[in-house]
């Protein structure tokens, strides 16, 4: 890796570190926070579903911002939107706001996150290629995931401990402060490199054009299409499980106010993410095809969730949680690399946002569905149901594998891609949340 690529990597890791610390202050306590505000299980997960619906609604428009105005602008808008909507969450908790207010602000939170989804990853990939980096993207993205895991570990443990020492609202205020700081950091360090925004005076036309391009390079590209069709099941389950584990583990532990235990659960996921990021390049070398890693990860993850559904021992549940997180974390950089190697630079942010949209759309349905299941049958049963839903993703991943795309075997960064993956004359195999 040359000096220019190292600088790009350092900026990427810095942004990842700060943003993840900000987000993870509340990850371990978010569901408990909503329940403490007076929401039922169904309402709490419905609020999360409205957050996800916001991501679905704004993925393409914010992708237009990233591709038309620059990834840096998109990132800055994301930090401000998230800071403002997080503060509104704190205010609503204080006044025990009605559900409709939680729904509205949750949509705004979703808007904030869509400014990030696709934009940072697209910025990284284009900047690395511009710098002359020819290595595999799994390595850089794996490091990003390790940094994300460390940040999540620090933030989630701190959030849980601070909540127990003070109250459930303080971690939300800390998140606002860190996001404001990240705005300043990004303003100073993040600049679009290797990418020239194409601005349009007609935003609606730009949205339609970019949406069409994302469909052409996404859903109309068979290897990408099947991975995207798997996303609603795997991503929807992942979102639900992460937040359901908080009250589930507190119930097993026997103390509904042991918020540090909820932070511990998020910390275990974070530590597993570090390990998973480290294992990603190794997992890639162990298998001839990237899709083999994805298929195995989905099957093993589903089995673990089914077992969690029948577990009544706290410490066994923690071990299973760690295994589930490691498996998912090891597969994530491989999936990123696979998808990035199949899409062209100009539409990269939008196609990645569209991919995120597909996953979010599953969360809109899966979260309230499983939340209602938790109300009726308990959290263990809802986790078992989540395992069944996860299995549905496997046939789509198998279908993607059958397309025999060059990116499925790729191990280094490609110079360019057409709709089907390879560059027109030469394809230098390459990789890429």
Language-model regions, residue ranges each:
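Juxtamembrane intracellular "pre-TM" segments in multi-pass secondary transporters
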Residues: 1-6, 191-229, 418-421, 425-432
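Helix-loop boundary and gating motifs at the non-cytosolic
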Residues: 2-57, 223-269
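C-terminal transmembrane bundle of multi-pass solute transporters/carriers
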Residues: 10, 45-47, 57, 239, ...
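Hydrophobic core of transmembrane alpha-helices in multi-pass small-molecule transporters
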Residues: 17, 85, 96-116, 316-330
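C-terminal ends and interior cores of transmembrane alpha-helices
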Residues: 76, 80-96, 102, 299-312
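Cytoplasmic helix-loop-helix junction between adjacent transmembrane helices
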Residues: 105-149
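Helix-loop junctions on the cytosolic side of multi-pass membrane transporters
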Residues: 168, 175, 180-203, 398-409
């Amino acid at each position: 890796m040359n000096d220019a690529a190292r600088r790009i990597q350092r900026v990427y890791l810095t942004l990842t570190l700060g943003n993840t610390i900000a987000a993870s202050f509340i990850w371990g306590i978010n569901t408990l926070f909503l329940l403490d505000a007076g929401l039922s299980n169904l309402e709490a997960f419905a609020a999360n579903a409205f957050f996800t619906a916001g991501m679905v609604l704004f993925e393409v428009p914010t992708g237009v911002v990233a591709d038309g105005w620059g990834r840096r602008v998109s990132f800055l808008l994301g930090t401000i939107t998230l800071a403002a909507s997080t503060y509104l969450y704190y205010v609503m908790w204080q006044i025990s706001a009605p559900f409709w207010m939680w729904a509205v602000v949750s949509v705004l939170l979703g808007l904030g996150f869509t400014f990030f989804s696709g934009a940072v990853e697209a910025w990284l990939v284009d900047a690395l290629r511009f710098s002359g980096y020819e290595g595999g993207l799994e390595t850089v993205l794996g490091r990003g995931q390790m940094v994300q895991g460390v940040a999540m570990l620090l933030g989630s443990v701190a959030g849980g401990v601070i909540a127990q020492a003070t109250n459930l609202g303080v971690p939300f205020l800390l998140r606002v402060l860190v996001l404001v700081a990240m705005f300043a950091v990004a303003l100073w360090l993040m600049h679009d490199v290797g990418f020239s925004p194409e601005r349009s005076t007609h935003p609606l036309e730009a949205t339609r054009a970019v949406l069409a391009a994302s469909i052409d390079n996404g859903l109309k590209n068979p290897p990408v299409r099947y991975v995207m069709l798997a996303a609603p099941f795997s991503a929807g389950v992942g979102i639900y499980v992460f937040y359901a584990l908080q009250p589930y583990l507190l119930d097993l532990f026997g103390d509904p106010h042991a918020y540090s235990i909820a932070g511990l659960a998020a910390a275990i996921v974070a530590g597993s993410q570090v390990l998973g990021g480290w294992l990603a390049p190794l997992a890639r070398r162990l298998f001839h095809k990237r899709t083999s890693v994805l298929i195995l990860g989905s099957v093993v993850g589903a089995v673990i969730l089914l077992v969690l559904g029948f577990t009544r021992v706290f410490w066994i549940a923690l071990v299973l949680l760690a295994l589930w997180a490691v498996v998912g974390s090891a597969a994530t950089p491989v999936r990123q690399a696979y998808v990035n190697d199949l899409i062209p630079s100009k539409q990269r942010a939008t196609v990645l946002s569209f991919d995120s949209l597909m996953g979010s759309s599953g969360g809109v349905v899966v979260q309230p569905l499983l939340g209602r299941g938790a109300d009726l049958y308990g959290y263990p049963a809802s986790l078992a149901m989540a395992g069944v839903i996860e299995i549905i993703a496997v046939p789509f991943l198998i279908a993607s594998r059958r397309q025999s795309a060059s990116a499925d075997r790729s191990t280094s960064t490609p110079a360019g891609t057409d709709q089907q993956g390879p560059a027109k004359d030469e394809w230098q195999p390459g990789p890429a949340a």
